[in-house]
């Protein structure tokens, strides 16, 4: 039995369906990320789980307790759920210590000790407990918000895009630190984000939301390498989608014969490769006289961005499945290491590693 069960959840705002039949199971102590474009319903779902609003239809069950069943709902303060918002939502007139201990009873003899302990757990020095929120950095404020949420010993932690306002480097380190803290505490966690890389790196389970319901739920690896459809493939990362015919575990495509993840046979199909599966090796036009199954291209664009370089490669020879000519005239967009990326005008040999995914 799942720790959190969501079944058939619906929510309307007037004629607009914010949620249109959401189902989700979350295991105890796990981390789940809900990712999707703005307006897809992910924040509405978080508000219903937290108890800030009630669903029109559907059930929410947490650790065997029914929190919501249609319009009947347990109040937010009785759910045992912690929430960390995007801006931290700290009280500006309170000290950091009082922010962390806001939900604790004033008469608790161990209140001060617990506040110091929580500050230590989230990586804050006790010296800052007498400061005000405006005296802290964005990363420190988010740690305070997390400590405040953990102070109530929640059964479930909800993170509503808590890292989006942080600088890129700090965002990555904070995400890793928060994941480790929550895992060590054994707290089941749901992260809502519009950042695909954040969702894939943070969670053991990722749910892609579109138009008020989940399009696909699974492990980060399965969603990235075996997306259900083209929309999910392109939403989760750069995608190379090619026409192909499938037979005997291989695809005949504009990039040649490529191993695929199915043994089905199809005359017409679409396959997915990720740009990192395409290898490049410098050569010359004279070096293009290899075996017939070799594929060559010319670099037509190169955009340096430090550690990475985005390059466009126009195929110079391609194979002959349907639409091959059109694909041959469309450059492949690839990301390679910025240290030794080929320059515009260079000739490269292309190779494919791993298997391509065949869309169902």
From Swiss-Prot:
Catalytic activity: Fe(3+)(out) + ATP + H2O = Fe(3+)(in) + ADP + phosphate + H(+)
Keyword Hydrolase set for record: no
Signal sequence segment: none
Membrane topology per record: Peripheral membrane protein
Pfam families reported in the protein's UniProt record: ABC_tran
Molecular function per GO: ABC-type ferric iron transporter activity; ATP binding; ATP hydrolysis activity
Entry keywords, A to Z: ATP-binding, Cell inner membrane, Cell membrane, Ion transport, Iron, Iron transport, Membrane, Nucleotide-binding, Translocase, Transport
Gene3D superfamilies: 2.40.50.450, P-loop containing nucleotide triphosphate hydrolases
Domain ABC transporter span(s) in chain numbering: 4-236
Amino-acid positions noted as binding ATP in the UniProt annotation, renumbered to this chain: 36-43
Subcellular location: Cell inner membrane
Source organism, top-level taxon: Bacteria
One GO CC annotation: plasma membrane
SUPFAM superfamilies recorded: P-loop containing nucleoside triphosphate hydrolases
First-level EC class: translocase
EC identifiers of the protein: 7.2.2.7
Location, primary (coarse class): membrane
UniProt-listed InterPro entries: AAA+_ATPase, ABC_SmlMolc_Importer, ABC_transporter-like_ATP-bd, ABC_transporter-like_CS, ABC_transpr_FbpC, P-loop_NTPase
Protein role: Part of the ABC transporter complex FbpABC involved in Fe(3+) ions import. Responsible for energy coupling to the transport system.
Quaternary structure and interacting proteins, as annotated: The complex is composed of two ATP-binding proteins (FbpC), two transmembrane proteins (FbpB) and a solute-binding protein (FbpA).
Family the UniProt entry places it in: Belongs to the ABC transporter superfamily. Fe(3+) ion importer (TC 3.A.1.10) family.
Protein name: Fe(3+) ions import ATP-binding protein FbpC
Gene name for this UniProt entry: fbpC
